[in-house]
Design a protein with these regions (language model features):
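Catalytic cores of the polymerase beta-like nucleotidyltransferase superfamily
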Residues: 1-380
Length: 380
C-alpha cells in the first residue's frame, strides 16, 4: 500500500494537472506521519510545491473556477471534494533574537529550497517526513532528511534542531504528541526542557493544543507537572490550574469548568474567564448546583407535606423555585447524576391547562407544573 493508492481519483486528476504546470508536489506534515503510524490518509493534506511560484498555482485555480484562500507565507488553501488542501512554498525560518512568542522568526521563501533546508523549521523529526508524489507515474518517494521514519518506529519524539527550544508552543506540542500517540520523549529533549521560556505563552495556543490532545484534563495535569518539576516561569493567568487535578473523562471546556468548580468553587470564575466563556456560564453552574444540593437534602416527608398543600395557600415558592431552576438550567444535569426523590422525569409529562393557570395566584403560576408533579408523585 502507498499513500498515492489512497488518494481518490478526482483528487489525483487535480494533482496531475498541477504537476503538468511544472510543479513538484510533496506531501508534508501530519499526513506522512499518520500514514506511517496507521496506514490512513487524512482529509487535511499539506503539500510543499517546488519549481514554480505560488502565483502560478493561484492563476490555475482561478482559471479552473476553484475557490481558494490566500494565507500568510504564500500558502494557498482549497476545499476540494471534502479534502482540505494546503499548498505552500518551501521556506526557511530565521530566529528573531529576543522574541519569545510563537512567531519568533522571519521567513525566507523559495521554490528551489532543498528538503533538508525547508524541513529544518519543523518541530519533531516525525513531522519532518515528506512523500514526493509523481502522479503521472502513480509513484512516490519518501523524503526523510532527519530520520523521522525510524523515530516513528521507535515511538520517540526527537527535536530537529536547537531552534526547538526557542518556541514556547513546542513545549505544548511536546505534551500533546507524547500523550496522543503514546510516544517517549527523547533524552536530548528531556535534558534541555528547562531551556524553554514560557513567560509569554499565550492562552490561545494553550487552549488550541489542549483541545487537539483529545484529553484536555490530562493535558493540563501534565502541563502542571512539568512546569512545577522544571520550575518554569509562566504567566499569572496559567496559575489557575495549580492544585487542580483532572481525569481522562474531562474532554470539553464545560467538563473542566465543572470539575474545577467541584474541587475549588472559587476557581470556576477564573476557569470560565480563561476560556473566554460568558460570565453567566459559571454563575449558572453555581446556581444549578445550589438548587441541586437543596433538593437533594429534602426528605420524603417534606415533599409529601408540600404536595398536600394547595398551591393557592403557599406564600413563597420555596422548594418549587429550586425545581424550576433545575429545569431552566438542565444542561448541567449530566454532571450531577445522584438520584433525587423528585427529579426531571416527574414533571416532564405534567401539563397545566389555562383554567388551572388562571385560578392560581400570579406569583405562583410559573411553579404550578412542579407542584402538580409533586402531587402526582407523592399522593397521600
Amino acid at each position: 500500500m502507498t499513500i498515492a493508492s489512497l488518494i481518490p481519483n478526482e483528487l489525483k486528476d487535480l494533482l496531475r494537472e498541477i504537476e503538468a504546470l511544472g510543479f513538484s508536489l510533496c506531501l508534508v506534515g501530519g499526513t506522512p506521519r499518520d500514514y506511517f503510524l496507521n496506514k490512513t490518509l487524512s482529509y487535511d493534506l499539506d503539500f510543499e510545491i517546488r519549481n514554480l511560484e505560488a502565483s502560478v498555482l493561484r492563476s490555475f485555480f482561478k482559471n479552473k473556477k476553484i475557490n481558494y484562500t490566500e494565507l500568510p507565507y504564500q500558502i494557498t488553501r482549497v476545499d476540494f471534494h471534502g479534502f482540505d488542501l494546503e499548498f505552500s512554498t518551501p521556506r526557511i525560518e530565521r530566529q528573531i533574537v529576543g522574541n519569545k512568542t510563537h512567531h519568533h522568526f522571519e521567513a525566507e521563501l523559495s521554490p528551489t529550497l532543498s528538503y533538508q533546508e525547508s524541513f529544518k523549521r519543523r518541530d519533531f523529526t516525525l513531522n519532518a517526513i515528506g512523500v514526493e508524489l509523481d502522479m503521472k507515474k502513480n509513484s512516490e518517494v519518501v523524503v526523510d532528511p532527519y530520520g523521522g521514519v525510524k523515530d516513528l518506529k521507535d515511538r520517540v519524539l526527537r527535536e530537529i534542531s536547537d531552534d526547538f527550544f526557542l518556541d514556547s508552543v513546542r513545549f505544548l506540542r511536546l505534551i500533546r504528541f507524547s500523550m496522543k500517540y503514546d510516544l517517549k520523549i527523547s533524552d536530548s529533549i528531556m535534558s534541555r526542557l528547562s531551556e524553554f521560556d514560557l513567560s509569554e505563552l499565550s492562552k490561545h495556543h494553550f487552549v488550541a493544543e489542549m483541545m487537539k490532545s483529545k484529553v484536555p484534563g490530562l493535558f493540563i495535569n501534565k502541563f502542571n507537572e512539568m512546569v512545577e518539576s522544571l520550575k518554569l516561569s509562566i504567566p499569572a493567568e496559567f496559575k489557575i490550574w495549580n492544585g487542580l487535578k483532572f481525569t481522562s473523562e474531562n474532554k470539553t471546556k464545560d467538563d473542566l469548568l465543572v470539575s474545577s468548580f467541584l474541587q475549588k468553587e472559587e476557581s470556576a470564575k477564573l476557569v470560565s474567564a480563561f476560556f473566554l466563556m460568558p460570565e453567566k456560564r459559571a454563575k449558572d453552574l453555581k446556581s444549578f448546583y445550589d438548587s441541586f444540593m437543596i433538593v437533594k437534602k429534602v426528605s420524603k416527608e417534606e415533599l409529601i407535606t408540600l404536595s398536600q398543600k394547595s398551591i393557592n395557600d403557599l406564600t413563597d415558592p420555596g422548594l418549587l423555585k429550586e425545581l424550576k431552576n433545575l429545569e431552566e438550567k438542565k444542561e448541567w444535569q449530566k454532571y450531577f447524576t445522584e438520584p433525587l426523590l423528585v427529579s426531571w422525569s416527574d414533571w416532564e409529562s405534567v401539563n397545566v391547562d389555562s383554567f388551572e393557570l388562571e385560578s392560581t395566584p400570579v406569583k405562583m403560576r410559573s411553579y404550578l407544573r412542579f407542584h402538580k408533579a409533586l402531587q402526582k408523585s407523592f399522593k397521600a
